[in-house]
Each structure stands twice: as C-alpha cells, then as structure tokens.
Amino acid sequence: MGKQKINAVVNGESNSTYIIAEIGVNHNGDINLALKMIDAAYEAGADAVKFQSFKSDKLVSRFAEKAKYQQDHTGTNETQLEMLKKLELSPEDHLIIKEYCAKKNIDFLSTPFDEETAIF
C-alpha cells in the first residue's frame, strides 16, 4: 500500500499507524460525555476521534420499530426514531466538539448520514 496523508500525518511503509477512536453515538447525546471520551482517546494516544452525524427524522421513519438487538438493550417502549433522537448531536454540539479537538490537538472526523449533516 502506498503512502496516505490525513491532515499532517503521512501513513504507510515506514511511518506509524494513524489511530482513529470510534466514538460514534456512544456519548448517548451528552456533549459532556463526548468531551470526556475525547479526553480518553487523547490519553490513549489516538490521532483522531470519529463521531456519527445525522438528523434522526431523515434517517428512519417515525413508524420504524427498533431492531431486535436494540429492543433487547433498551426496551420496546419507544420507536427507533425516538431512540435515535436521544443520540443526536446538534450542529452547535459538533462545533464545540471540533473546537475541543483542535485544542487537544486530536483530529475530528464524523460520518454523515444525510446530505444536510454532510454539508455542515
């Protein structure tokens, strides 16, 4: 594999591995928990943290039931939309997270799930 460049880090051949800490939605929609997870990733030596960016109502139907594994872990008293809404971070939250990452000198990445969050 040839060399790859992510920000100022060049990977491949004799260079070190670029480590991405996948936070995803494990912050449970809590910005303070997200910041603590960034701290943990930084302390563990990660080069980047990766989140998931989405608008729940653009991701699933309001009639969609939760998948079996979701029901097993979080119960059946809400729809998939209601569950995902709790995991959503606002655009303002993303900016706070991005700025926090810059201060910590750790790269911010996010996987967008819709066009609106990809543009932001």
What do these predicted regions represent?
Residues 1-20, 94:
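N-terminal amphipathic alpha-helix/helix-capping segment at the start of soluble metabolic enzymes
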Residues 9-12, 28, 41, 55-60:
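Active-site acidic carboxylates
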Residues 14-17, 44-46, 104:
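Short coil/turn connectors at secondary-structure junctions
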Residues 19-23, 49-51, 108-111:
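Hydrophobic faces of well-ordered beta-strands that scaffold small-molecule active sites
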